[in-house]
Amino acid sequence: MAAGCSEAPRPAAASDGSLVGQAGVLPCLELPTYAAACALVNSRYSCLVAGPHQRHIALSPRYLNRKRTGIREQLDAELLRYSESLLGVPIAYDNIKVVGELGDIYDDQGHIHLNIEADFVIFCPEPGQKLMGIVNKVSSSHIGCLVHGCFNASIPKPEQLSAEQWQTMEINMGDELEFEVFRLDSDAAGVFCIRGKLNITSLQFKRSEVSEEVTENGTEEAAKKPKKKKKKKDPETYEVDSGTTKLADDADDTPMEESALQNTNNANGIWEEEPKKKKKKKKHQEVQDQDPVFQGSDSSGYQSDHKKKKKKRKHSEEAEFTPPLKCSPKRKGKSNFL
């Protein structure tokens, strides 16, 4: 293990990752610092664990005067690679301590064996757990995500979705995507890779929420419009109807009052300035006192003005003819008396 650890290649730095990203094979990988990695531990679906661990290191004789540098080189070479002793993938470390005062040399091996202790942040996902990634690639066959800025995750197109449905999904570059861990792989160089799986139900739920919001907004607008119209129309129709009824009542009352005034004025020959109701009452009383027999009414009980005029004319004619009848017997009486 000591020889393997010493000869293991160093992980790609940020500059190397940019070259790989330009080729289109892998996105740009950036190793987080220990402080940044500790900040990600408490995030949702991080699958990160922080804690102290001990490691066995075979240090080359050239690092006898630079032990810390040699230890860091070996630990850096193991970052982003699965470690059986750590049961995960280390992404950052700090606070290195050498356990014991002296190292050990076994037989004729030239390396010095040391035990160290350091604080590690380990990425240890398991199949079935959920992760959050940033979308950095969208194609017709899969979606590429970057988890914690350093792990590449590939999410293939689900078999249940057709090509049209896959293209119409609202997933863009830079979006945060939630997925489920399906399988954990590593390439020939030992770089850790994640195979993910989309949750179709969550995607359909998002679509249904959007459609429900659209339908609810449409129904609310459709429900509000007729209500406003009804509120506007009802008072208008009511006001118009009430206005017409009032006008009709006034129109019916005015000709009756005018005709009654004209009849009373023609009969008496005098224009009076008394209220209209009093004139009507006086007319009815005079007609009833003078000639109650000739009062006519319609089937509805309403007394017509035309009949009143006829009655008054007959009454006036009788009044004109009555004086000569009264005078003639007086003259005859006088002649007979003589």
From Swiss-Prot:
Top-level taxonomic group: Eukaryota
Phosphoserine modified-residue sites: 242, 304, 316, 328
Region (Disordered): 209-338
Subcellular location: Nucleus, Nucleolus
A Pfam family the protein falls into: RPA43_OB
Tissue specificity annotation: Widely expressed. Expressed in all fetal and adult tissues tested, with highest expression in fetal lung, liver, and kidney, and low expression in all adult tissues.
Biased composition (Basic residues): 328-338
Record's keyword terms, sorted: DNA-directed RNA polymerase, Nucleus, Phosphoprotein, Transcription
Positions of modified residues (Phosphothreonine): 322
One GO CC term, this protein: nucleoplasm
Function: Component of RNA polymerase I (Pol I), a DNA-dependent RNA polymerase which synthesizes ribosomal RNA precursors using the four ribonucleoside triphosphates as substrates. Through its association with RRN3/TIF-IA may be involved in recruitment of Pol I to rDNA promoters.
Oligomer status and interactors: Component of the RNA polymerase I (Pol I) complex consisting of 13 subunits: a ten-subunit catalytic core composed of POLR1A/RPA1, POLR1B/RPA2, POLR1C/RPAC1, POLR1D/RPAC2, POLR1H/RPA12, POLR2E/RPABC1, POLR2F/RPABC2, POLR2H/RPABC3, POLR2K/RPABC4 and POLR2L/RPABC5; a mobile stalk subunit POLR1F/RPA43 protruding from the core and additional subunits homologous to general transcription factors POLR1E/RPA49 and POLR1G/RPA34. Interacts with RRN3/TIF-IA.
Family: Belongs to the eukaryotic RPA43 RNA polymerase subunit family.
Protein's recorded name: DNA-directed RNA polymerase I subunit RPA43
Organism: Homo sapiens
Chain's gene name: POLR1F
